[in-house]
């Protein structure tokens, strides 16, 4: 109670209230989250088809090219498309863990684990945000959201991981 009244500013309290119940302000701060969940739900199992989603085409889903790309994906490709994206990120993380295990040094291993953690944090926060399990943030979905700086950083990070793979293969070849 004390932290709520004195530790948080008004806009921070409003964000927490809207995270817990976005219907308190459906045309204001809760609009993004409500439209996002409606978009994902309207996709059903197989979706409406690429570029065929009504909420997406009519731009009811705000920021659908950046923060809410998963909502647009859910509407147009449905549960199956969302599941494939999540499985793709899980496969990427599994591969990064394998790369970390095979790295030449602890430093390289920790770099790869850090990059994997960074990417998975972004994925989890973005997906949780779009399905209503987390507060609305500005974190993009790696490799899918429009955002040049985030995309460049993510590709540089994967480039570092590929360098670790190359170095570990080179040292393995020298051992043979």
Give the location of each predicted region.
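Hydrophobic, glycine- and aromatic-enriched re-entrant/interface helices and adjoining loop segments
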Residues: 1-84, 103-111
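Hydrophobic alpha-helical segments of integral membrane proteins
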Residues: 5, 86, 118, 158-163, ...
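Transmembrane helix-bundle signature of multi-pass membrane transporters/permeases
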Residues: 60, 72-75, 115-119, 147-150
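Lipid-exposed faces of alpha-helical membrane segments in multi-pass integral membrane proteins
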Residues: 80-94, 113, 117, 121-124, ...
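Membrane-proximal intracellular helices of multi-pass ion channels
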Residues: 83-86, 94-108, 113, 173-176
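Structural signal for the C-terminal ends of transmembrane alpha-helices
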Residues: 90-101, 161-169
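Loop-to-helix entry and N-terminal half of a specific, functionally important transmembrane alpha helix
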Residues: 99-138, 144
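A juxtamembrane structural motif centered on a specific transmembrane helix
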Residues: 124-176
């Amino acid at each position: 109670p004390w932290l709520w009244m004195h530790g948080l500013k008004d806009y921070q309290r409003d964000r927490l209230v809207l995270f817990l119940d976005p219907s308190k302000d459906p045309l204001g701060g809760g609009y993004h989250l409500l439209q996002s969940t409606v978009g994902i739900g309207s996709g059903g199992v197989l979706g409406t088809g690429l570029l065929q989603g009504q909420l997406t085409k009519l731009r009811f889903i705000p920021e659908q090219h950046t923060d809410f790309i998963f909502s647009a994906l859910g509407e147009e490709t449905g549960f199956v498309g969302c599941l494939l994206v999540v499985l793709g990120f899980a496969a990427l993380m599994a591969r990064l863990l394998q790369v970390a295990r095979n790295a030449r040094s602890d430093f390289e291993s920790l770099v790869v684990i850090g990059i994997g953690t960074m990417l998975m944090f972004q994925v989890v926060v973005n997906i949780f945000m779009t399905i209503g399990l987390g507060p609305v943030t500005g974190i993009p979905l790696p490799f899918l959201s429009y955002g040049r700086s985030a995309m460049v950083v993510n590709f540089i990070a994967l480039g570092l991981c590929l360098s670790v793979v190359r170095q570990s293969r080179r040292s393995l070849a020298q051992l043979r």
